[in-house]
Amino acid sequence: VLLAIDVGNTETKLGVFARKGNDGFGEPARTWRVTTERRCTADEFGVLFAAMFHRAQISPADVRSVVISSVVPQNDRELAQACEQCFHCSPHFFTATNQNLLAVRTERPKELGSDLAAAAIAASALYGAPTIVVSFGTATTFGAVARDGAFLGAAIAPGIQISIEALVARTAKLPHVALEAPESSIGVDTVTALQSGIVYGFVGQTEGMIVRMRRELGEDAKIVATGGLADIVARHTTVIEHVEPHLVLLGLYRYAQGLPVAENQTGPA
């Protein structure tokens, strides 16, 4: 099997896939989601792997390839060492510039996050291009894939959760609230006023950005959302056509189809 790992700023997602043909797509057989911890040791990663695989009744010996997207580089070396110890193969670190599935037509391709590139690969392969990929994570990102399949660029805004945390931290009387939509956009108390501003505010942001980007990409651009909070926004707008929670993992999986079932792949420099 293939193990795909998406190391994000807030959460790390892992998925196990059965390898298929070069054009194959398949949902992960098992996924996990854990909090991203800075400065984990190889032993700590190893304990995590052992616990997850044991509970899922999957043998680590079945893992023949590991591919990683990481936006937390300080963990890369220890993570690679843990993969070598647990799965006896060196992981391949996916980046926007070491793949040939997505042409990157930005001014500085090396600055494109590996997670955005992997999500764009999966979204355009699954749903076609042009595509706008909206990721609701630590940041809210809008990635633009042109009609010919090239990645043109993105817009980046503060994420929903960090916006809430910043608002509460900088105000004396505003409480933490459940992230859910109130019945009315006009809040009748502090809690519903906050919920309206947060949920419907981000819905409005999403709709507005999609309108602007469709003017440049084409009105037929598909809208694909991912990230832990995508469902919350998607429930309150009609512009999001597809929600795929495992989009980055699926992009890594598709990328891995072109790799050998490898021992001795390249780890971080």
Residue ranges, per PLM feature:
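Gly/Ser/Thr-rich loops at beta-strand to alpha-helix junctions
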Residues: 10, 72-74, 138-141, 231
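A short helix->loop->beta-strand "cap" motif at the edges of active sites that frequently abuts
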Residues: 87-90, 221
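Short glycine-aspartate micro-motif
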Residues: 2-6, 67, 131-135, 224
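Phosphate/pyrophosphate-binding loops at sites that engage ATP/ADP/AMP, CoA/4′-phosphopantetheine
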Residues: 49-65, 210-221
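ATP-binding/phosphotransfer module of carbohydrate and carboxylate kinases, centering on a glycine-rich
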Residues: 1-5, 36, 40, 163-269
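Phosphate-bearing ligand-interacting subdomains
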Residues: 53-58, 62-84
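Short glycine-rich, Thr/Ser-proximal phosphate-binding strand/loop in the N-terminal lobe
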Residues: 2-56, 150-175, 181-184
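Phosphate-binding/catalytic loop of phosphoryl-transfer enzymes
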Residues: 81, 89-93, 98-170, 199-210, ...
